[in-house]
């Protein structure tokens, strides 16, 4: 089982890289975000997920363990194979995926090749409990590892947050940006803030461009 490759980038393609490790070239499939950070002729270290089948051994490479862990998490969803998981990671970083899933933002997933509305809903539904509470509480260095074992429902306070998010969406904001604004203001105002207070504060954040 190959877990990590360290060597020179021999060549790059649309969805792959060849890593030269002491004269042996390994073909590694990567997301476009990972490929954009690699350069032919330079040294690189890739964390690797190995998939063994009867007819092939496939390697998937990632510059960070967080992206690799998301790849593993995504492929637990029925209908999400390695190719689709990489397509999703090509349009959203691990932190962005946490936000997308916690916000139940279907549009954020359907941007990826191979992800239609039905599959997007399945991904959001199956991963919500694992990723949602991490995004609501802010990101931590081990966030996705915690999410992999998380089974607790979202906090009770999420009801007021969901009301605030829905109100902002009705005002024309995208669901993801509304979720980010409400999450930020909820952390600032604390548990005492009701949905109306969250809406007012979130609108100030959105109006001042304080997010992102």
UniProtKB/Swiss-Prot annotation:
SUPFAM superfamilies in the record: DNA helicase RuvA subunit, C-terminal domain, Nucleic acid-binding proteins, RuvA domain 2-like
Gene3D superfamilies (alphabetical): 5' to 3' exonuclease, C-terminal subdomain, DNA helicase RuvA subunit, C-terminal domain, Nucleic acid-binding proteins
Region Domain I, residue ranges: 1-63
GO biological process, one term: DNA recombination
Alphabetical list of InterPro entries matching this protein: DNA_helicase_Holl-junc_RuvA_I, NA-bd_OB-fold, RuvA, RuvA_2-like, RuvA_C, RuvA_C_sf
Region of interest (Domain II), ranges: 64-142
Keywords annotated in UniProt: Cytoplasm, DNA damage, DNA recombination, DNA repair, DNA-binding
GO molecular function, one term: four-way junction helicase activity
Region called Flexible linker, residue ranges: 143-155
Cellular component terms per the entry's GO annotation: cytoplasm; Holliday junction helicase complex; Holliday junction resolvase complex
Keyword Transmembrane helix (UniProt): no
Entry's localization field: Cytoplasm
CDD domains documented for this protein: UBA_RuvA_C
Region (Domain III): 156-212
Region forming the signal peptide: none
Domain notes: Has three domains with a flexible linker between the domains II and III and assumes an 'L' shape. Domain III is highly mobile and contacts RuvB.
Quaternary structure and partners: Homotetramer. Forms an RuvA(8)-RuvB(12)-Holliday junction (HJ) complex. HJ DNA is sandwiched between 2 RuvA tetramers; dsDNA enters through RuvA and exits via RuvB. An RuvB hexamer assembles on each DNA strand where it exits the tetramer. Each RuvB hexamer is contacted by two RuvA subunits (via domain III) on 2 adjacent RuvB subunits; this complex drives branch migration. In the full resolvosome a probable DNA-RuvA(4)-RuvB(12)-RuvC(2) complex forms which resolves the HJ.
Family: Belongs to the RuvA family.
Protein function: The RuvA-RuvB-RuvC complex processes Holliday junction (HJ) DNA during genetic recombination and DNA repair, while the RuvA-RuvB complex plays an important role in the rescue of blocked DNA replication forks via replication fork reversal (RFR). RuvA specifically binds to HJ cruciform DNA, conferring on it an open structure. The RuvB hexamer acts as an ATP-dependent pump, pulling dsDNA into and through the RuvAB complex. HJ branch migration allows RuvC to scan DNA until it finds its consensus sequence, where it cleaves and resolves the cruciform DNA.
Protein name in UniProt: Holliday junction branch migration complex subunit RuvA
Organism the protein comes from: Paramagnetospirillum magneticum (strain ATCC 700264 / AMB-1) (Magnetospirillum magneticum)
């Amino acid at each position: 089982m190959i877990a990590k490759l360290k060597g020179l980038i021999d060549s790059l393609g649309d969805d792959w890289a060849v890593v030269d490790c002491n004269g042996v070239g390994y073909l590694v499939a990567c997301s476009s975000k990972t490929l954009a950070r690699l350069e032919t002729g330079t040294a690189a270290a890739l964390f690797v997920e190995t998939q063994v089948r009867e007819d092939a051994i496939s390697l998937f490479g990632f510059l960070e363990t967080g992206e690799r862990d998301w790849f593993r998490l995504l492929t637990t969803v029925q209908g999400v194979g390695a190719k689709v998981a990489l397509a999703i990671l090509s349009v959203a970083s691990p932190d962005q995926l946490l936000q997308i899933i916690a916000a139940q933002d279907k549009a954020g997933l359907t941007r990826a090749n191979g992800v239609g509305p039905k599959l997007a809903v399945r991904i959001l539904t199956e991963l919500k409990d694992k990723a949602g509470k991490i995004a609501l509480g802010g990101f931590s260095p081990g966030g996705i590892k915690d999410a992999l074992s998380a089974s607790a429902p979202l906090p009770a306070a999420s009801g007021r947050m969901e009301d605030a998010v829905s109100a902002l969406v009705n005002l024309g904001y995208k669901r993801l940006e509304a979720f980010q604004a409400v999450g930020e203001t909820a952390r600032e105002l604390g548990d005492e803030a009701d949905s109306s207070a969250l809406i007012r504060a979130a609108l100030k954040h959105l109006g001042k461009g304080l997010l992102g």
